[in-house]
Regions:
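Twin-arginine (Tat) signal peptide motif
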Residues: 1-10
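Sec/Tat signal peptide C-region and signal peptidase I cleavage site
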Residues: 22-29
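Bacterial N-terminal signal peptides
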Residues: 11-22
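N-terminal secretory/targeting leader peptides
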Residues: 5, 14, 30-120, 129-132, ...
């Protein structure tokens, strides 16, 4: 009897030990990832990134625990892009203009007036041309682009309204430090001034710059309308954001996990894009109600100036890629 009881106790202890080891293995297998961006918590780029993080955790049965860090919490846009390479950040959503620093070709998406509208940009994101760029970018950097989100048509805000390219002459305007972003203001004789995204509001408020350019949804979220009197509907760049996964994460994922990360981030991008397009359609009237002057532009004057003063080839892009983008449907 005593012998039988001892055997039962040993069996129970063994089962408990195996259970504890199994639990420990599960904990060890869980991966905590950092997903960074520079946008506000109210914006779809954040809310849908949080949705994607939760969805990935759910679909992986808790293997991947992703924390989303918004509003430049982990650094400026340059910092978080560098973090992918350094291994300090695991995922980001950011503009292709930063990817362009390592792979020039992808920056053609910022050439002024290259996209007709948001639908055209999203058609390009599904095109063979963009998939070719994704592969070449990955081959060069190890970073994997999994999704493309519509960011919005970039409009110009300023203290003083203008109606055409000539009216921009001499204005000190904040733009990201990327040649294609500088192309329109430079073509019109303005003075483009690079300032970190998180510092733009203060720069407008204290007069360091006279103007800035961003989509209407960003102008709302960052409250730039509080320190600017007019919004000019230039729509000079139809902008997007790319979701990127660092090499030290992507290379360790199984094929099934890579597929899952791609599917979920693409779903999040589609959700955010739809929200941005809807909100853009509402904001002109809302800004008018806030007392902001809305100015319809002579966009052809901007296009002509860009084509004359900043031709495609001068920025390092090719006519072949431009023509393929124009054909995207």
């Amino acid at each position: 009897m005593k012998k039988r009881l001892s055997l039962q106790l040993l069996a129970t202890a063994g089962a408990l030990a195996i259970g504890l080891l199994g639990s420990s293995a599960t904990v060890q297998a869980q991966q905590k990832l950092k997903w960074a961006h520079v946008y506000e918590t109210s914006e779809p780029y954040h809310t849908e990134s949080v949705w994607a993080a939760d969805e990935i955790k759910k679909r992986s049965n808790g293997k991947f625990e992703i924390q989303v860090f918004p509003a430049s919490t982990l650094g400026k846009e340059t910092d978080i892009n560098q973090g992918l390479t350094l291994g300090t950040i695991d995922m980001i959503i950011s503009g292709p203009s930063f990817a362009e620093r390592n792979y020039k070709r992808i920056g053609i998406a910022y050439y002024p007036f290259i996209f007709r509208d948001g639908d055209h940009l999203l058609a390009y994101s599904k095109s063979p041309l963009f998939q070719e760029m994704v592969k070449e970018f990955h081959d060069k950097t190890g970073i994997q682009i999994t999704a493309y989100t519509y960011y919005g048509a970039r409009q110009t805000t300023a203290q003083k309204a203008f109606t055409n390219c000539e009216g921009m002459k001499g204005i000190k305007i904040r733009v990201p430090d990327v040649p294609a972003y500088r192309a329109t203001p430079e073509a019109c004789g303005a003075n483009p001034t690079p300032i970190a995204f998180a510092e733009v509001y203060l720069a407008l408020q204290n007069g360091t710059v006279d103007a800035q350019e961003n989509p209407l949804t960003t102008i709302e979220a960052k409250k730039f309308y509080e320190v600017q009197k007019a919004i000019m509907l230039t729509a000079h760049i139809v902008d997007g954001l790319i979701t990127q996964i660092a090499p030290h994460v992507w290379n360790k994922l199984s094929d099934a996990e890579k597929k899952m990360f791609t599917e979920v981030t693409q779903q999040a991008a589609a959700r955010a894009s739809a929200l941005i397009k809807k909100r853009e359609g509402e904001l002109v009237d809302e800004f008018k109600k806030k007392g902001v002057q809305i100015v319809t532009m002579d966009r052809k004057s901007f296009q002509d100036a860009v084509l004359k003063n900043k031709p495609l080839e001068s920025l390092g892009f090719t006519r072949a890629d431009y023509d393929k983008i124009q054909a995207a449907k």
